[in-house]
Amino acid sequence: MNISRIIICVAACLAVLTSCRKEDVIEKPTVTPVEPSGPADDPSRAVVGFYLLNEGNMGSNKATLDFYDAASGTYTRNIYGAANPSVAKELGDVGNDLAIYGSRLYALINCSNKIEIMDAATCRRMGQVNIPNCRFMAFDGPFLYVTSYAGPVVIDPDYKQLGYVAKVDTATMEVVATVTVGFQPDGIAVSGRRLYVANSGGYMAPHYERTMSVIDIPEFRVVDTVDIGLNLGLVLADNCGQIWVASRGNLYDVGPRLYCYDIAAREIVADLEISVGDMWLDDDLIYIVGNEWSNVTMKNTVSYAVVDVRSRKKVSDSFITDGTETRISKPYGVAVDPVSKDIYVTDGRNYVNPGDIYCYSPDGTLRWTTPTGDIPAHIAFLLR
């Protein structure tokens, strides 16, 4: 796969931006030299680079895509508009999840109620799937599974609309089935023949949800509902038959936690006092960044952690070793290169202006940093 196709596509499309969008003000892509991820002439390089989805503040319609080319060591901001000059309003409002599956790139745009589907090699748009208030994605076989709040963005302790999981045929890009789960379902993960869905009840404060819905994939129905903890968020499945579920607490007297659910035993086997803003599984380690807001102190507490999934214990309070974490205002996203093991941390800063991405070597020392779009959040690695 030749990643130069992305840059060529961007350059070619810049010439037609004005004619296609006479009434829009479109920020052109900007290319910043950083550092390559390894020897530029290495023919065995497995990771071509990564896409970064910037969420953009709600209501601003400023979700954008960036791309890091690992071979050339260049970081390009805002590539979607140039690659797709005829698409009105670009990506949309609030980019909430990003994934590469097969040869396609999937960007979930929460408040635009859609999943944008692109060619992973060129970023060219292939189509979209419309799902109201969509939140997170997981894949299994020929299907994409998407959590949906189903209802409008309304804070209401008596919210009546249950959420659901949509089953999308990746070939036809159509929703083929839905199954009802709890209120405001967020994270979703696949393990074996089942889906694990975290119900948050995030619109219903102080009456948050506590449950995780378990869905049988072949039958596509809920087969179990497990009490986990308050206001659940992200979910990931490890290689040890365990599901890790983050609880955000209630921002007052119940703090955030990270729970480990043993699938075979059908019980919680670990309860860790860790704030999870984002987490990434690499081999047997979970890398975590946290931002714990308190409505009591009206302060935000930043944290980092590494958890070993086999011991089910926190093995480090940080994966940054050179003290440069003090430069990061709001650690918002984290990812680990599956080959080089470089660690990426995004900084949301004030959630209004452009953020930054920091690249750390496996030993935790800073390699490079560069500006991003607004609220940089979700990373998907492009493999050769």
What spans do the regions from the language model cover?
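Predominantly soluble domains enriched in secretory-pathway, periplasmic, or organellar proteins
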Residues: 5, 21-384
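Bacterial N-terminal signal peptides that target proteins for export
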Residues: 1-8
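C-terminal motif of bacterial Sec signal peptides marking the signal peptidase cleavage site
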Residues: 16-19
